[in-house]
C-alpha cells in the first residue's frame, strides 16, 4: 500500500509577506495587482477571507468587500527562495517529490525509513520543520493515493494534518460530495447534479459502462474515484506540460471581433517563447483561454489543429461562443510533447 503526503502552504504569498513585514499581520491583506490596473488577487490571508475575498477575484471587487484591504505587490523571488527551502526539507525524507506549484507538492514516502516508515510522523515532522525554519505554516494530508491526500490536506486548513488510512477510504469517499473529485469542474458537477448524483455513494450506483456513456473516457475515471481508486504515481520530474501567454485588458473586449483583433500580438509573444524552448520539447495541441467580464472562463484545445493564425481564430470563435460576453482576459498556448521521454523509450530497444 502506498503512502502519499500532500503538503500545501497556508496562503503562501501572503504568509511570506506577513513574515517579512510583521505590521501586515492581524489585518486583512492580499497579494495581487492594483485595482486601478484591473489587477487580480493572487492570494490573501485569513483575515481577508473572512470578508469573502478570494484568489482570482478582481482587486476592485475585493476592495468593495473589504475597504480596509491592503494589497501588496508580489515578490516572486522571495516566494521562489522560500519554496526552494521547503523542497530541501522534503528531499531529506524522499526523492519522490512532485511539485504542483511553488507552495504545494506530493511526496511518496512508501519506502522512506524515517520514523519506521510512518507517513503520519513524517508529515508532522515536515510541518514542524517548515514552521521552525521559515516561520510559516503548512497543512498536510496523508492517504494511500494522490487524490485522497490532496483532499486530506484541505480538511483541517490552516495549519492542520489529516490522515486517511487504507481502512477508512471506503467510508470516507462514500460521503464525499462529487464536486470534490479530482477533475470534476463546474460543468461536470452540474451535470452530475442533474443526474441525481451528489455524493460518491450515489455515484457508485452507476455502472462503469453507464458513466462512460454519459461522460466519455472521464466516466472511467469517475468510476474509480468513487471507490477511492487513483493509480497516478508521484512524478519527480517537473517537466513543462504547456507554454502559453495571456493578457488582462484595461477595458473589456466587447465582442468576438475585438478578441480576434488581439490574436496576432498574442501569437507573436507565444512563438517567441516557443523558440526559446530546448529541443526536447515539441509543440503539440493548440489551446485558447477566455475569461469573461464576470470571471467565468473556458479553455478550448484541439488535437491535430495547426498553430497558425486561422487555427487559433477558429478555436477562439468556439470558445467565445460558450459565454458570448465581454472578455477581460485572453490567452493562447500549446500543449507540449516531451521528446526526451520518447527518445529514452526508443533506447530500450537498441538496433541489433
Question: Can you annotate each of these PLM segments?
Answer:
Residues 1-214, 220, 338-340, 345-352:
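Gly/Gly-Pro- and Ser/Thr-rich, intrinsically disordered tail segments characteristic of DNA damage-repair
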Residues 6, 180, 188, 193-329, ...:
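DNA-contacting surface of Y-family translesion DNA polymerases
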Amino acid at each position: 500500500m502506498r503512502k502519499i503526503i500532500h503538503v500545501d502552504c497556508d496562503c503562501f504569498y501572503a504568509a511570506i509577506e506577513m513574515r517579512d513585514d510583521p505590521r501586515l499581520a492581524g489585518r486583512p491583506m492580499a497579494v495581487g495587482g492594483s485595482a486601478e490596473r484591473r489587477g487580480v488577487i493572487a492570494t490573501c490571508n485569513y483575515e481577508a477571507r473572512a470578508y469573502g475575498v478570494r484568489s482570482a477575484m478582481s482587486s476592485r471587487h475585493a476592495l468593495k468587500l473589504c475597504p480596509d484591504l491592503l494589497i501588496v505587490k508580489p515578490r516572486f523571488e522571495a516566494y521562489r527562495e522560500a519554496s526552494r527551502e521547503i523542497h530541501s526539507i522534503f528531499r531529506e525524507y524522499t526523492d519522490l517529490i512532485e511539485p504542483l506549484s511553488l507552495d504545494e507538492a506530493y511526496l511518496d514516502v512508501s519506502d522512506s525509513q524515517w520514523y519506521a516508515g510512518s507517513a503520519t510522523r513524517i508529515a508532522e515532522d515536515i510541518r514542524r520543520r517548515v514552521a521552525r525554519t521559515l516561520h510559516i505554516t503548512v497543512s498536510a494530508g496523508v492517504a494511500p493515493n494522490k487524490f485522497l491526500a490532496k483532499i486530506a490536506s484541505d480538511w483541517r486548513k490552516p495549519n492542520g494534518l489529516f490522515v486517511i488510512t487504507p481502512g477508512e477510504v471506503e467510508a470516507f469517499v462514500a460521503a464525499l460530495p462529487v464536486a470534490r473529485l479530482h477533475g470534476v469542474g463546474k460543468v461536470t458537477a452540474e451535470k452530475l447534479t442533474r443526474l441525481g448524483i451528489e455524493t460518491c455513494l450515489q455515484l457508485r450506483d452507476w455502472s462503469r459502462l453507464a458513466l462512460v456513456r454519459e461522460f466519455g473516457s472521464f466516466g472511467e475515471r469517475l468510476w474509480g474515484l468513487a471507490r477511492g481508486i487513483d493509480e497516478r504515481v508521484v512524478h519527480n520530474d517537473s517537466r513543462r506540460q504547456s507554454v502559453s501567454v495571456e493578457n488582462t485588458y484595461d477595458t473589456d473586449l466587447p465582442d468576438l471581433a475585438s478578441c480576434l483583433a488581439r490574436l496576432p500580438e498574442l501569437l507573436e509573444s507565444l512563438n517567441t517563447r516557443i523558440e526559446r524552448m530546448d529541443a526536447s520539447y515539441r509543440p503539440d495541441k493548440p489551446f485558447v483561454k477566455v475569461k469573461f467580464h464576470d470571471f467565468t472562463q473556458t479553455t478550448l484545445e484541439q488535437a491535430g489543429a495547426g498553430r497558425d493564425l486561422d487555427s487559433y481564430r477558429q478555436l477562439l470563435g468556439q470558445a467565445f461562443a460558450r459565454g458570448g460576453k465581454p472578455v477581460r482576459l485572453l490567452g493562447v498556448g500549446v500543449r507540449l510533447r516531451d521528446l526526451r521521454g520518447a527518445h529514452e523509450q526508443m533506447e530500450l530497444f537498441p538496433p541489433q
